[in-house]
């Protein structure tokens, strides 16, 4: 099955819009004793001039709301002088017209999601299950403040590039059987979880070529790069034993190895045990208490 969604949104604020394309694919099949399920999703989004929020100087709603009731909003249209500089006296709030027509921000996002699962039904009691998943996010954000903007008098441009990737792999063996009055279920498996995030931020100040919004138009530029990587390797198992649908015993054990902890002290194990007694099985069928259990 394949679906496509096309979303277009033109904001009530001039110079603002959003477009989003979503592609979805889902397929499954059986090949003998093997069942396969796969899904994929791709989302592409482009946004022009996201609104500022909170107490930002560029929050248009806040700036209009805090105007005196005697202030004519028509006066705001005179937002620049003859030299195209900021024409305002308030250093704490940006004229909405200036923010709309002189400042800008743009973003693009590409997101990929993949999920796959295969189940091998070896026999009626035993099966193997493998699962893979991945999520890749690529986000680019450009924020521009024209020269003479309050707080950015020399001009400002920042380009941020985010590359976030996550992978998950799991393999499970599942067994269930019944012997007389006993029910038995067991699970044994392992998992690998990986994160790889990279961020690059380029900041430019002191704009010299006002007509060209680009890094080359600025005198000063700086580069900041950050990365975050993590991997967790896990093994785990669970056992459940039941007797006559009356008594149940459960035990689990899991061990994780984290790449972010010191070598030699990066493994942690946590077991669990529980038991339950379904006393309602000893009672005659009653509408008053159809099911009761101590755990």
State where each predicted segment sits.
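Surface-exposed loop/interface segments of Gram-negative outer-membrane beta-barrel transport/assembly proteins
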Residues: 11-16, 22-111, 129-233, 260-262, ...
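Outer-membrane beta-barrel strand-turn architecture
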Residues: 30-33, 120-124, 177-180, 242-245, ...
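Extended, hydrophobic alpha-helical segments in both membrane/secreted and soluble proteins
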Residues: 23-25, 130, 169, 233-239, ...
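Short, charged, low-hydrophobicity "junction" segments
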Residues: 66, 245-247
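Aromatic- and histidine-enriched alpha-helix N-cap/loop-to-helix transition segments
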Residues: 110, 267-268
């Amino acid at each position: 099955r394949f679906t496509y969604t096309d979303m277009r949104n033109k904001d009530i604020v001039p110079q603002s819009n959003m477009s989003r394309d979503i592609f979805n694919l889902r397929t499954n099949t059986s090949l003998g004793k093997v069942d396969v399920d796969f899904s994929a999703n791709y989302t592409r989004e482009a946004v022009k001039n996201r609104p500022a929020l909170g107490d930002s100087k560029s929050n248009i709603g806040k700036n209009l709301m805090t105007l005196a009731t005697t202030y004519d909003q028509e006066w705001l249209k005179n937002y620049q002088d003859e030299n195209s500089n900021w024409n305002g006296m308030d250093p704490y709030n940006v004229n909405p017209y200036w923010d709309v027509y002189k400042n800008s921000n743009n973003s693009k996002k590409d997101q990929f999601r993949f999920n796959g699962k295969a189940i091998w039904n070896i026999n009626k009691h035993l099966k193997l299950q493998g699962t893979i998943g991945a999520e890749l996010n690529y986000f680019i954000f450009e924020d521009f403040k024209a020269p003479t903007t309050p707080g950015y008098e020399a001009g400002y441009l920042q380009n941020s590039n985010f590359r976030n990737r996550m992978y998950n792999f799991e393999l499970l063996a599942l067994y269930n059987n019944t012997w007389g009055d006993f029910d038995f279920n067991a699970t044994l498996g392992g998992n690998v979880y990986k994160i790889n995030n990279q961020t690059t931020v380029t900041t430019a100040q002191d704009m010299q070529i006002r007509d060209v919004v680009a890094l080359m138009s600025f005198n000063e530029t700086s580069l900041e790069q950050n990365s975050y990587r993590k991997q967790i390797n896990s093994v785990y198992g669970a056992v459940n034993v039941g007797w006559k649908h009356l008594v149940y015993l459960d035990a689990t054990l899991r061990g994780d190895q984290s790449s972010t902890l010191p070598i030699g002290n990066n493994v942690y194990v946590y077991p669990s045990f529980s038991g339950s007694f379904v006393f309602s099985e000893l009672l005659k069928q009653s509408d008053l208490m159809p099911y009761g259990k101590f755990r």
